[in-house]
Amino acid sequence: MENSLGGGTQPPRSDKEKMIRGSAWMTAGSVFSRILGAIYVIPWRIWLGAAFLTANALFTKGYQIYSLFLIISTAGVPGAVSKQVARYNAMGEYKTGMRLFYHGTFAMFIMGILSCGAMWLLAPLLAAGDARMIPVFRSLAWPLLLIPSLSLIRGFFQGYNEMAPSAISQFIEQVARILYMLVMTYAIMVAGNHDYLNAVVHSTFAAFIGAVFGLGLLVVYFVRQKPRLDTLVAQSKQALNISVNEILVDVARQAIPFI
């Protein structure tokens, strides 16, 4: 049975076509995101002016710690979920894949709460005596609330050979992050009180804004595909007797080597 969630009026695509199409989407999303990431620095640097070097140092230090939390909470999850969902689909066990989606998303949301709380509470310790870093770290705690769930949903769609949702959501996430970052930096440094620390805090908080938009797009896509998913679930063989814990442990085993 066709595992892709493509339009109902379109003929099924071959594995080769799906692979090429998926690679094209992921490559395009990555290229556009990198281009945006390179361009935004120019106006950001200009508007920060003489405070740029200090602001950039705070920004970079914040993201270094944030990246560690991100690796711990999400590393390997999209690939592991994609592999498991594809395996269940190949077996005709679509219902098991949906169980993974629902319970996995909840588990990753709990992971997000724990990661967010840990970074928020540890901010004074992580700041190592630099009080300016505390609000920077805490602004970066917020995206940790959403990104674990976001990564699992992307992996779920990849398991159906649907790369477009991941690529487009990553692009939208990047656009929203950069727009918020630049708008707030301009409002503070050009039209406001020139508080560079406040500009940095909003620049790092922009990661949360991006995550909201990226997650929102994936939720919309999921709702639109729900009827097709329900049809596949109704056709599920249901011959696989596996508990929720076993499903999640299998995903963890796939993901942990990537950490």
Name each model-derived stretch.
Residues M1-I39, R99, K237-F258:
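N-terminal membrane topogenesis motif
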Residues I72-F106, G159-A164:
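Transmembrane-helix boundary and interhelical linker motifs in polytopic inner-membrane proteins
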Residues L114-I134:
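Short membrane-interface helical motifs at transmembrane helix boundaries
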Residues G129-I153:
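Alpha-helical transmembrane segments of multi-pass membrane proteins
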Residues I147-S169:
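Membrane-interface junctions at transmembrane-helix termini in multi-pass inner-membrane proteins
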